[in-house]
Amino acid sequence: MKSAILTGLLFVLLCVDHMSSASQSVVATQLIPINTALTPIMMKGQVVNPAGIPFAEMSQIVGKQVNRAVAKDETLMPNMVKTYRAAK
């Protein structure tokens, strides 16, 4: 229970810290194996080219699985996350 609360708190702090960085994309902080459910600790916001999933939408992909292995420091693209739909 405590770890779930701490994970949630970390997620909120990460989002608040990066809310003003609209041009950032979600980037993997570690190797993410295929079919792994994403957690906040696995991701960070970073300005990259080409742009991937906007960091502002990170909360939408937490808990979703990746459909292929994602390398450390690789940008998460919309087609890499199962059932991800971009915000309109």
Curated annotation (Swiss-Prot):
One of its GO terms (cellular component) is extracellular region. Residues 1-23 form the signal peptide. InterPro entries: AFP_Neu5c_C, AFP_Neu5c_C_sf, Antifreeze_III, SAF. It is found in: Secreted. Its main location: secreted. Residues 25-84 form the AFP-like domain. The record marks Q30, N35, T39, Q65 as: Important for ice-binding. It comes from the Eukaryota. CDD domains: Antifreeze_III. Keywords: Antifreeze protein, Secreted, Signal. Disulfide bonds: none annotated. Contributes to protect fish blood from freezing at subzero sea water temperatures. Lowers the blood freezing point. Binds to nascent ice crystals and prevents further growth. Belongs to the type-III AFP family. This is Type-3 ice-structuring protein 1.5.
